[in-house]
Amino acid sequence: MKLKEILTSIQPVKITGNQDIEITGVDIDSRQVESGHLFMAMHGTQTDGHAYIPAAVEKGATAILCEELPAELAEGVTYIQVADSEDAVGKAATTFYGNPSSKLELVGVTGTNGKTTIATLLYNTFRYFGYKVGLISTVCNYIDDEAIPTEHTTPDPITLNRLLGRMADEGCKYVFMEVSSHSIAQKRISGLRFAGGIFTNLTRDHLDYHKTVENYLKAKKKFFDDMPKNSFSLTNLDDKNGLVMTQNTKSKVYTYSLRSLSDFKGRVLESHFEGMLLDFNNHELAVQFIGKFNASNLLAVFGAAVLLGKKEEDVLVALSTLHPVAGRFDAIRSPQGYTAIVDYAHTPDALVNVLNAIHGVLEGKGKVITVVGAGGNRDKGKRPIMAKEAARASDRVIITSDNPRFEEPQDIINDMLAGLDTEDKKKTLSIADRKEAIRTACMLAEKGDVILVAGKGHENYQDIKGVKHHFDDKEVLKEIFSLTV
């Protein structure tokens, strides 16, 4: 593709050099540059891509996109100066890969909790209907049934457009995608065309990055502000920010709720450990999910599928066949008669939702033992809140290590313990070794009890000092239960 074709989608401040050159690849990582590539320098959170411009030129880059031009311009290289490289990178990548999102029905899911579940269940629902479908999520990316490992909730713009391009080329009609607040703020989705967007909820998370809840809200809201006119926005009325999210959107707004009058109205009729009986828009259905938060997630899936043209009755049949997503309220029964639940809950609100769901099913007939930690080098303010919520809704709590990253596990545990009063501390243990913490919970559990192992869910590693060590909560539980993994 000619450089001048790529530049039609962005507004350069200044161009130095030949725009008629052939571009054979686009990169934001100088290590991946090859001869004939366009290297795009971004101000990253860890490193500044501008520092790698000489390395990119040395490796054969024939064009450089940047915010600040180097002091010395290499001969035979075209330099494109832009005001905002984050925005330009997304648009350039979209153009280079043939604007793949315009060939797909792309639906984005954003919010603090529920993104993975809703995106994955939509993917499974439309596969049930017989379509080729793509999924971009925290757990794994999929092109129909081909799994593609994932590093981030939302990939960088180049990886994202390359992936969407493959999905379009391989015949996918629908793609369901988690859209993180980081990706919106960093404009990773710049240039993409969405057919629809779903808002789940907004609670405290990622304040290490966004600094304030207001900034976090603005990042989420921008996704809906940028929605095109002929798309839909489906928002959760049960969240106080539901209508705030869509107040400036050009898209058609629809609502879903378990509490209020809405376009898609749901109720929980019955709840058991095996699942729930629900009412969606005056239709009853039985599902293999537990908890009001999952009823809300399923209602969002129902609404989105209907907005994408499916009949309500057909969607209800599809929903009744679905299974819970890996690491989301993932229950296994022990030979001793207690139940262990592995869940990704890593925010105070998500933890409350899971514990409430457990109590809703238990009805006071067994103890709840919660194993929980908090991630290192992340929002420290939520640590004492997590511990307090765990203690409030559990009979025993074991505070342990999660992904300590570059912090000391005991320091994180101490931050969590600071949220507990004297009564809370009487029922709380702190065990830094996560495996030992889970083992202790199993030793304390009796028939009819429930152990919640919270925070990591689907993850199969522990991030310690920059190294990912294999660790899987479900594997550990099965090992303790003496079950075959």
Curated annotation (Swiss-Prot):
Per UniProt, subcellular location reads as:
Cytoplasm
Chain positions recorded as UDP-N-acetyl-alpha-D-muramoyl-L-alanyl-D-glutamate binding sites: S30, T153, T154, S180, Q186, R188
Reported function: Catalyzes the addition of meso-diaminopimelic acid to the nucleotide precursor UDP-N-acetylmuramoyl-L-alanyl-D-glutamate (UMAG) in the biosynthesis of bacterial cell-wall peptidoglycan.
Gene name?
Answer: murE
GO BP, one annotated term: cell division
- Please report which protein family the annotation says this sequence is part of: Belongs to the MurCDEF family. MurE subfamily.
Q: Keyword check for ATP-binding, yes or no.
A: yes
Spell out the molecular function terms from Gene Ontology. Answer: ATP binding; magnesium ion binding; UDP-N-acetylmuramoylalanyl-D-glutamate-2,6-diaminopimelate ligase activity
Supply the name of the protein.
Answer: UDP-N-acetylmuramoyl-L-alanyl-D-glutamate--2,6-diaminopimelate ligase
